[in-house]
Amino acid sequence: VYIDPGDVILVESPTFVHSVEIFEMFEAKCIGVDMDEDGMKMDDLEAKIQKYHPKMIYVIPTFQNPSGRTLSLERRKKVAELSAKYNVLVLEDDPYRDIRYSGEDLPPIKCFDTVGNVVVANSFSKIFSPGVRLGYVMAEPETIHYLTEAKSATNSHTSMLPQVLCAEFFKRGYYPAHHKMLCDLYRQRRDAMLECIDKYFPEGTKHSFPDGGLFTWV
């Protein structure tokens, strides 16, 4: 919908490799933005916006793949501010936000979007079933229109069966207990992994300690 050959997309460094592959399939150029413990660094982001004039900023703000880091509240506000200041689209990919073990939920970048430049993409595959490839988008009506047209041109529509199954799952109230089970299970796996890293990896090895999600960075 938005990408043309030669467009620049700013991405976190590191980021989800499959997204980079998709962007490059449409002949876009991906430029990495430095990160620290609070996610994408805003000074580097603004400098690269000024230098490369990107079409889009791609960010995974919560429990990022692959680092496990979470973009801080102030930086979420700043991303929205820079998006408005330089008129750059933001693709906020946020499929891990509901898999939280501790800490407070942070509002999406979209909450601070004053000009309609932020598009949120989310997924049911992480919280319902990995085999059910369903997701959703939150965006301005015009953007939804173009995305719907593009979706129709690729495969007409997503199969109705997984859509109905997912809808009924939530409608019948199964999600709260399922969500608790998921978080308990993944928390145990995180703790076991970090314990093994501390015990068996070479002395001096450092790792992130994510409050949720499916990733840690060693």
What are these regions (language model features)?
Residues 40-101:
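Active-site phosphate-binding strand-loop segment of PLP-dependent enzymes
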Residues 11-28:
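Substrate-binding/gating loop at the entrance of the active-site cleft, primarily
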Residues 167, 184-194, 204-218:
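Conserved glycine-rich beta-strand-loop-beta hairpin in the small C-terminal domain of fold type I
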Residues 1-8:
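Phosphate-binding glycine-rich loop
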Residues 7, 28, 55, 85-89, ...:
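A short helix->loop->beta-strand "cap" motif at the edges of active sites that frequently abuts
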Residues 111-184:
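Conserved core segment of the aminotransferase class I/II
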Residues 10, 29-37:
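Short beta-strand->loop structural element characteristic of the AMP-binding/adenylate-forming
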